[in-house]
């Protein structure tokens, strides 16, 4: 364990496949360093694999291909409520929609 105080860190991507294949090692390293890691993505078959590794994965109400304004507002509202409840120290979005919406919601939540 490092001498850095533990933080809650959110990793947000547009697929659970992406988190599993490209950010799994980061999530595990952060967790093993004492941080609380929350993974967010739309539902998929890899969410269960992430949980099986002992990681916390939450299914986000996101359609990565949609531009429906109501769906996008629903996602922003969901993220805002989640960030207010969880109070993460850091939100890191890996794809454009996740980076933009995650940043907007994090800012509004005071992250």
What does each model-found stretch correspond to?
Residues 8-70:
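N-terminal strand-loop element at the rim of the active site
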Residues 7-10, 106-111:
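Active-site proximal beta-strand in glycosyltransferases
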Residues 25, 74-81, 101:
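Alpha-helical elements of Rossmann-like donor-binding domains used by nucleotide-donor carbohydrate transfer enzymes
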Residues 8, 89-90:
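Structural motif
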Residues 41, 92-93:
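Short beta-strand scaffold positions
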Residues 93-99:
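Short His-centered aromatic/hydrophobic patch
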Residues 82-89:
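Glycine-rich phosphate-binding loop signature in dinucleotide/nucleotide-binding domains
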């Amino acid at each position: 364990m490092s001498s850095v105080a533990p933080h809650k860190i959110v990793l947000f991507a547009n697929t659970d496949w992406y988190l599993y294949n490209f950010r799994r090692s980061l999530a595990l390293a952060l967790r093993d360093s004492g941080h609380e890691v929350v993974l967010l993505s739309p539902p998929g078959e890899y969410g269960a694999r992430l949980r099986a590794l002992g990681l916390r994965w939450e299914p986000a109400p996101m359609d990565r291909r949609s531009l429906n304004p109501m769906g996008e507002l629903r996602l922003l509202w969901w993220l805002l409520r989640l960030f207010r409840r969880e109070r993460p120290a850091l939100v890191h979005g890996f794809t454009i929609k996740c980076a933009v919406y995650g940043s907007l919601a994090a800012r509004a939540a005071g992250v």
